[in-house]
Amino acid sequence: MQVITLQKPSKKITYRTTYILKPSLTEEEITKEIEDYQKLLIDNGAEDIIIENTGKCRLAYLINKQNDGIYFQITYRGANTLVNILQRRMRLSINTLRYQTFKV
């Protein structure tokens, strides 16, 4: 008897991840962080990637002894496993202060 396993096609959902980088980073370091996240998304099958720099803002409370942060938003379409991969990378990054992902 032959066993056939059926895989569900992964549905692409639109997500928006907002993250805050340290304000002490240089332009080159900021660009490298953005490119690393973008490459990670592309390598894992994300589509329609839009990255927005919303600028440097004062934080409501101290995060890792920082008063300010540089805010970015990434909007992308991908499978739900992609969110876990991106958030794991952000959690391990010393330059990312906070991140939050929403379904759009």
From Swiss-Prot:
First-listed, main subcellular location of the protein, grouped into a coarse class: plastid
Subcellular location field: Plastid, Cyanelle
SUPFAM superfamilies from the UniProt entry: Ribosomal protein S6 (SSF54995)
Gene Ontology cellular component list: cyanelle; ribonucleoprotein complex; ribosome
Coiled coil: none
InterPro entries, per database record: Ribosomal_bS6 (IPR000529), Ribosomal_bS6_CS (IPR020815), Ribosomal_bS6_sf (IPR035980), Ribosomal_S6_plastid/chlpt (IPR020814), Transl_elong_EF1B/ribsomal_bS6 (IPR014717)
Keywords assigned: Cyanelle, Plastid, Ribonucleoprotein, Ribosomal protein, RNA-binding, rRNA-binding
Swiss-Prot/TrEMBL GO biological process terms: translation
UniProt cross-references to PROSITE patterns, sorted A to Z: RIBOSOMAL_S6
Superkingdom, natural source: Eukaryota
A family per Pfam: Ribosomal_S6
Molecular-function annotations in GO: small ribosomal subunit rRNA binding; structural constituent of ribosome
Family: Belongs to the bacterial ribosomal protein bS6 family.
NCBIfam families: S6
HAMAP family: Ribosomal_bS6
Function, as annotated: Binds together with bS18 to 16S ribosomal RNA.
Name of this chain's protein: Small ribosomal subunit protein bS6c
Species of origin: Cyanophora paradoxa
Lineage: Eukaryota, Glaucocystophyceae, Cyanophoraceae, Cyanophora
